[in-house]
């Protein structure tokens, strides 16, 4: 399903393999760079896959030889798969390009989405993504990851929000290169089912905040 407003086209792509999604990102990116179309966001789920950003160290990777796709985003290694909502915003940033400000907008959008479900989440200084703060259940836990690239003033890659995914996939890696914190999901924190289908309309409502006024 595709939703188009004057400022943004949102494409619900369903379940899409990582390589196919990457091809679609690049196609949209070229069109936005060439001014052939406006900003767009792909929303989807991936079949289970590990992807490694440019700062991934050898010891961050799975020890059991599980395949990893190396990608040109920032950050380190992470997992994508069923039960996780992935968003790839393809947006033209205003000049001068401020990547940090854009990442902060993505973080705030996801913080606001979590709040709608009743989960208090926020930032941790020096770490990207959206976090549930440390409490009596354990150390700080990441509920949403962010990995961005900007090429010719237009964004690529994006964010992933853990809804009700199998968190044991993270046990094989050092997720995002951070060994002293955990990973969580909306369902795990709230103690009730929160599916990708539940999260989709909430995320869609908040996506326009990524476009700088």
Curated annotation (Swiss-Prot):
EC number: 2.3.1.181
CDD domains referenced in this protein's UniProt entry, alphabetically: LipB
Residues at the active site: 176 (acyl-thioester intermediate)
Residues the entry annotates as binding substrate: 73-80, 145-147, 158-160
Principal EC category: transferase
Keyword list, A-Z: Acyltransferase, Cytoplasm, Transferase
GO MF term list: lipoyl(octanoyl) transferase activity
Pathway: Protein modification; protein lipoylation via endogenous pathway; protein N(6)-(lipoyl)lysine from octanoyl-[acyl-carrier-protein]: step 1/2
Reaction(s) catalysed (UniProt annotation): octanoyl-[ACP] + L-lysyl-[protein] = N(6)-octanoyl-L-lysyl-[protein] + holo-[ACP] + H(+)
Subcellular location per the Swiss-Prot or TrEMBL entry: Cytoplasm
Main localisation: cytoplasm
Gene Ontology CC, one term: cytoplasm
GO biological process: protein modification process
Site residues by UniProt (Lowers pKa of active site Cys): 142
Ion transport listed as a keyword: no
Ranges where the BPL/LPL catalytic domain occurs: 35-213
HAMAP family: LipB (MF_00013)
Other comment: In the reaction, the free carboxyl group of octanoic acid is attached via an amide linkage to the epsilon-amino group of a specific lysine residue of lipoyl domains of lipoate-dependent enzymes.
Family: Belongs to the LipB family.
Function: Catalyzes the transfer of endogenously produced octanoic acid from octanoyl-acyl-carrier-protein onto the lipoyl domains of lipoate-dependent enzymes. Lipoyl-ACP can also act as a substrate although octanoyl-ACP is likely to be the physiological substrate.
Name the UniProt record assigns to this protein: Octanoyltransferase
Top-level taxonomy: Bacteria, Bacillati, Actinomycetota, Actinomycetes, Micromonosporales
């Amino acid at each position: 399903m595709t939703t188009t407003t004057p400022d943004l086209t949102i494409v619900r792509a369903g379940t899409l393999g990582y390589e196919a999604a990457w091809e679609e990102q690049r196609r949209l990116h070229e069109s936005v760079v060439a001014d052939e179309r406006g900003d767009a966001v792909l929303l989807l789920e991936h079949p289970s896959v590990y992807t490694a950003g440019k700062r991934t160290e050898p010891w961050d990777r799975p020890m059991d030889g599980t395949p990893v796709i190396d990608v040109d985003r920032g950050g380190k290694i992470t997992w994508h798969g069923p039960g996780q909502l992935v968003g790839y915003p393809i947006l033209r940033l205003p000049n001068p390009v401020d990547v940090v400000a854009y990442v902060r907008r993505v973080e705030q959008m996801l913080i606001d989405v979590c709040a709608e479900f009743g989960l208090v989440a926020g930032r941790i200084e020096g770490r990207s993504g959206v976090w549930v703060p440390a409490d009596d259940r354990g150390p700080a836990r990441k509920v949403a990851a962010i990995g961005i690239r900007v090429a010719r003033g237009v964004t690529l890659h994006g964010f992933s929000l853990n809804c009700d995914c199998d968190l044991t996939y993270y046990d094989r890696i050092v997720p995002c290169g951070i060994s002293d914190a955990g990973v969580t999901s909306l369902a795990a924190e709230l103690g009730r089912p929160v599916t990708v289908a539940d999260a989709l309309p909430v995320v869609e409502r908040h996506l326009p905040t990524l476009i700088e006024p």
